[in-house]
């Protein structure tokens, strides 16, 4: 999770986020080298009187500055396309969860379980327990099993929202009348925080997402408990 005065990304929790961090470092290195070269040329031009004002043709130079940017773009595009393919690939998910955005809360439905659906509201600041995080805690966390592929279906009941979980490298738009599909896999247990990342009205900043990744045994116990509680609640 993020912490005050943090530099860089949150700790990666999924293989996708690890790939995104490597790609970020790879691209940043290329940008740094290009910027250094441009800065060096500018300084050289400002500090020397030897300029080629009479040069009319330089095919070798033109060939180099045409081919070199093309090679650099390929070096950026290939890993980017690979990660895009990995993010869209969904193979035999263990379960499917539908997340619906509302003004201003989230609702979740486990489509593989009967009557397992609930709303998730932010806990007001005055109701927080010691140690809980302001504007990030919810009354009902979404619990999922770790180390298993999970398919998320994202949509909205009213306006545009965005379901975002930085530690997992996920961000999907919630659009009314349309289902967006993403996959997530957590490599470790823990509680992870996200928020709506699309301005959706006056309480946009009060739509946190809390995802608890746990063992499969704990998840099955939690799902059974939630089903029993919801069945009793709606009798």
From Swiss-Prot:
Name of the protein this chain belongs to: Cytochrome c oxidase subunit 2
GO molecular function, one term: copper ion binding
Species of the source: Didelphis virginiana (North American opossum)
UniProt family annotation: Belongs to the cytochrome c oxidase subunit 2 family.
UniProt topological domain (Mitochondrial matrix) ranges: 46-59
SUPFAM superfamilies named among the record's database cross-references: Cupredoxins (SSF49503), Cytochrome c oxidase subunit II-like, transmembrane region (SSF81464)
Catalytic activity, as annotated: 4 Fe(II)-[cytochrome c] + O2 + 8 H(+)(in) = 4 Fe(III)-[cytochrome c] + 2 H2O + 4 H(+)(out)
Record-linked InterPro entries: CcO_II, CcO_II-like_C, CcO_II_C, Copper_CuA, Cupredoxin, Cyt_c_oxidase_su2, Cyt_c_oxidase_su2_TM_dom, Cyt_c_oxidase_su2_TM_sf
Short name of one Pfam family: COX2
Intervals, Mitochondrial intermembrane compartment: 1-14, 88-235
Sequence positions that bind Cu cation A2: 196, 198, 200, 204
Gene Ontology biological process terms, A to Z: ATP synthesis coupled electron transport
Cofactor: how bound: Binds a dinuclear copper A center per subunit.
Residue positions binding Cu cation A1: 161, 196, 200, 207
EC number: 7.1.1.9
PANTHER family: CYTOCHROME C OXIDASE SUBUNIT 2, CYTOCHROME C OXIDASE, SUBUNIT II
GO cellular component: mitochondrial inner membrane; respiratory chain complex IV
Spans through the membrane: 15-45, 60-87
Membrane topology: Multi-pass membrane protein
Residue(s) carrying Phosphotyrosine: 218
Gene that this sequence comes from: MT-CO2
Top-level lineage group: Eukaryota
């Amino acid at each position: 999770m993020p912490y005050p005065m943090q530099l860089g990304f949150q700790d990666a929790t999924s293989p996708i986020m690890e790939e995104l961090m490597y790609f970020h470092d790879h691209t940043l290195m290329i940008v740094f080298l290009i910027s250094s070269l441009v800065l060096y040329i500018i300084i050289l031009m400002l500090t020397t009187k030897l300029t080629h004002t009479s040069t009319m043709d330089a095919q070798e130079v033109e060939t180099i500055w045409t081919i070199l940017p093309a090679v650099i773009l390929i070096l950026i595009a290939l890993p980017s396309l690979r990660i895009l393919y990995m993010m869209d690939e969904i193979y035999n998910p263990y379960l499917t969860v539908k997340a619906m955005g509302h003004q201003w809360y989230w609702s979740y439905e486990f489509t593989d379980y009967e009557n397992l659906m609930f709303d998730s509201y932010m806990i007001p600041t005055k109701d927080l327990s010691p140690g809980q995080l302001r504007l990030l805690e919810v009354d009902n966390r979404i619990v999922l099993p770790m180390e298993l592929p999970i398919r998320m279906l994202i949509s909205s009941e009213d306006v545009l929202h965005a379901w975002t979980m930085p530690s997992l490298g996920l961000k999907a738009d919630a659009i009314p009348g349309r289902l967006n599909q993403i996959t997530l896999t957590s490599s470790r247990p823990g509680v992870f925080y996200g928020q709506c990342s699309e301005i959706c009205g006056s309480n946009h900043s009060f739509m946190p997402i809390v995802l608890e990744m746990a063992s499969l045994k704990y998840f099955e116990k939690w799902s059974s408990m939630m089903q029993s509680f919801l069945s009793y609640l709606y009798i």
